[in-house]
Amino acid sequence: MVIMARPYWSGQLRISLVSFGISLIPATESKSEIHFHEIDRETGQRVRHQKVLPESGEAVENREIVKGYEYSKGKYIPVEPEDIQNLRVASSKTIDLEQFVTVDEIDPACYEKPYFVLPENASQAEAFAVVRKALEETGKAGIGKIALAGREHLVAICAPGNPRLLGLMAYTLRFAEEMRSAEQYFAGIEAGKVDPEQLSLARELIQRKSSSFDLKKFKDEYETALRELVDARLKHVALPRQEVATARGKVIDLMDALRRSVGEENGRKKSVSGAQHRSRRKSKGEQKLKVVRSGSSSDKRRKSA
């Protein structure tokens, strides 16, 4: 049984005079099964960290700790949790979609975290469905602001890429001041001359390695390696050694590397194609055999009759 995640945020989605209730649920979760603690190397006991006053060294309980803003060196003003909760920020309860843009206009570097957007209850379903359909047909994303996790975020709300999914997607975005200038970092790259033959080979290599994107094909190999390490420790066996890739020979230049890469892809494609062809022939042969056997049985029945 799948345990449904609880809403992370609930409030109103507003477009001009249209307003209805929605809930946001995080679209991602951590699947890591390996969690490390800090332990003492000699005793193996877990190390605990205490929060202490710097002058007296006296430990402070969590219930006695509040946030503080340092307005001068070593001087703070306390800020209670209630003070933050009572901030008069409209986006804490309402996402007001201020403008709509084509989804492709949003720079992928702006995206932070995805959320599923659902109608808050059955009475909100009609308005939700109308807005969702309009976003899907126009290919637009609504841009607004939302207060989450102690700060305000830009948020883009759009229809999912799969039309069979009847919800909406929300993506928190970074503000302009959070983005580093790409021009500043790329300015030192010189526009080198591109060799037409090298470009042709690079295009061919990309084309041969192109396929439909399937996220399930990619696995977290680092997590797997950590699991092997932990299992080896538990069983008191030698630690698994990392396989070193065998050298493929010295690459003379870019042209040579491109040609060899395209050649390897050609060989791989032929190998896969041959295996698939043999599999199809084997399958057809088995089907013919079944037909022959089936026919033999019917002949026997006719003879016995």
Curated annotation (Swiss-Prot):
Q: Which InterPro entries match?
A: Ku70/Ku80_beta-barrel_dom, Prok_Ku, SPOC-like_C_dom_sf
Q: Where is this region: Disordered?
A: 263-305
Which parts of the chain span the membrane according to its record?
Answer: none
Q: Name one GO molecular function term.
A: double-stranded DNA binding
According to its UniProt entry, the protein's GO biological process terms are: DNA recombination; double-strand break repair via nonhomologous end joining
Q: Which SUPFAM superfamilies match?
A: SPOC domain-like
- The UniProt record lists the Ku domain at 16-202
- Ranges in coiled-coil conformation: none
Keywords recorded for this protein, A-Z: DNA damage, DNA recombination, DNA repair, DNA-binding
State the family it belongs to: Belongs to the prokaryotic Ku family.
What does the subunit comment say? Homodimer. Interacts with LigD.
Purpose: With LigD forms a non-homologous end joining (NHEJ) DNA repair enzyme, which repairs dsDNA breaks with reduced fidelity. Binds linear dsDNA with 5'- and 3'- overhangs but not closed circular dsDNA nor ssDNA. Recruits and stimulates the ligase activity of LigD.
Name the UniProt record assigns to this protein = Non-homologous end joining protein Ku
